[in-house]
């Protein structure tokens, strides 16, 4: 459903991220720090840290910044101790929304998240209210024009779970969260470079929003993304504006 909007949605997401590069650096440093604290400072034995470092270097973060974040996570440098929290709720037309945060002040964060939901026509739900509607997986999105047959063969040989052909001509490769890095690297060596590659929470069923509803939903998502403590926002909504 709503495959025709997939590429437009991804391009909007990338443009929004590029416009908030400073905020992205802050979020990536938090993720690297927490990943190192929980799993150690060696990316070869810590997949979460490896992903965070890959993303940081993909955004041209200086190596010194990355190394300092790892040292803070490992306790070699002093730093803020962040707590991971997930909030769940509903947006326009009941579209599911998950908000992943890292914070040193839970009270401040929940107040900001609740305010964004309330102001923009959504509702903050309880733990577990929408998480079951999403699948934790790796996602690689390829622009329209990539050879479907060749990508399908290469992806399945690399260990991907599925290859989805969207109505707009874009292709999605779905992996398990633990096999994402190996599939991505194998495909890149075979000449397939994804426009977007991430471990994400993919909705099991999408909700197509059009016109005013799509505009309202975008405002809610933007408001959540603008909160300093927010790391990622996931939604079942596909916006057709």
From Swiss-Prot:
InterPro entries in UniProt: Integrase-like_N, TACO1_YebC-like_2nd/3rd_dom, TACO1_YebC_N, Transcrip_reg_TACO1-like, Transcrip_reg_TACO1-like_dom3, YebC-like
Gene Ontology terms, MF aspect: DNA binding
Keyword annotations from UniProtKB, A to Z: Cytoplasm, DNA-binding, Transcription, Transcription regulation
TM helices/strands, residue ranges: none
Pfam families: TACO1_YebC_N, Transcrip_reg
GO cellular component: cytosol
Biological process, per Gene Ontology: regulation of DNA-templated transcription
Annotated compartments: Cytoplasm
NCBIfam families noted in UniProt: PRK00110.1, PRK12378.1, YebC/PmpR family DNA-binding transcriptional regulator
HAMAP family referenced in this protein's UniProt entry, alphabetically: Transcrip_reg_TACO1 (MF_00693)
Record-stated family: Belongs to the TACO1 family.
Protein's recorded name: Probable transcriptional regulatory protein NE0210
Biological classification of the source: Bacteria, Pseudomonadati, Pseudomonadota, Betaproteobacteria, Nitrosomonadales
